[in-house]
Amino acid sequence: EAVEHELFSIELDSIAVKGKKDAVRIFTVLGNNDWVFHNTSWYFNQQQHDKFLIFYRKQQWTTAERFANDLKREWPEMADYYNIMLSRIEEYKKNSPGDDWDGVYRATTK
């Protein structure tokens, strides 16, 4: 519990690795209290990121793309992540995960 107050993180994804049924939620650490103090835009970016994940998991691809592209510009440290997610969105637009998709990325390779 002490870590929660010293480090700030965001959820990146929910992934099921090849051969596994259950998903694991993946997070990244953004920084500590000092980092937050010097990065005043982190809270806004975190809120926008949370909205991105909601639209992504609801298959609202156009809106998710808009959020990802905006966040890439506003949060350059996270640009590689958003590029990966934008690639996934493009793939999902071509091959829908289906109406019953639970928002979990299912890896096809190890």
Task: Indicate where each model-derived feature is located.
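Intrinsically disordered, low-complexity, charge-biased linker/tail regions
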Residues: 98-110
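Extended, hydrophobic beta-loop-alpha segments that form or line the acyl/peptidyl-thioester binding
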Residues: 67
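Cytosolic regulatory/linker segments at or just downstream of nucleotide-handling modules
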Residues: 1-54, 58-61, 70-94, 98
